[in-house]
Amino acid sequence: MKILIDNGHGIDTPGKRSPDGILREYRYNREIAAALVHQLRERGYDADLLVPEDEDIPLTVRARRVNRMCETLGKDNVLLVSIHCNAAPPDDGGWHNARGWSAYTTEGFTESDVFADFLYAAAEEVFTKEKGLSVRKFRNAKYEKDWEAQFYILRKTLCPAVLTENFFQDNKADVKYMLSAAGRQDIVSVHLTGIENYLKNRKR
């Protein structure tokens, strides 16, 4: 199984930062993605960064990289996670109240939703109310916790794929947690546990 970790955006993407500029999403995504790949490799998994560059590689190119791997190994032998930080409307450069962790798949039920369930299970164990944290679930869905959206990186790739929104870069409490050593490791650990448990339980 090839595990591809995508780090959203790039150094040249406008905006995408906390209002005080301390957190820049492209950098944070890359730090989390690199730590996750490192820990996956330490556990013996075949994991790679999808975008080693600092620049914002176009989504068409990102999807092509994933699908090339799917064509080589088979789409059932590739797994994709796209790492992002969330932001609340309006895009006014200010702090907002929305908080929490969430994950997205495409519309309808696919293997990506099965994968997302394992990520949510891991998130609910770590991002607890006792820590002052929250996990955002799609409450209108009867069987699924993840949100659904037609994000290009999910819609145009052939393998199971989930996009995670790792808290809000425009919420002061979330940013404080995200930038803490404990917060960083928690976010990496949730992805690591979710990936491992999915791979251990997936139907062959």
Residue map of PLM features:
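Mature extracellular/periplasmic domains of secretome proteins
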Residues: 59-76, 151-156
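Extracytoplasmic/secreted envelope proteins and their assembly/folding machinery
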Residues: 33, 37, 60-63, 100, ...
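Soluble non-cytosolic domains of exported or imported proteins
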Residues: 23-31, 56-60, 109-114, 178-189
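Sec-exported extracytoplasmic/periplasmic mature domains
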Residues: 34-45, 67-71, 120-128, 183, ...
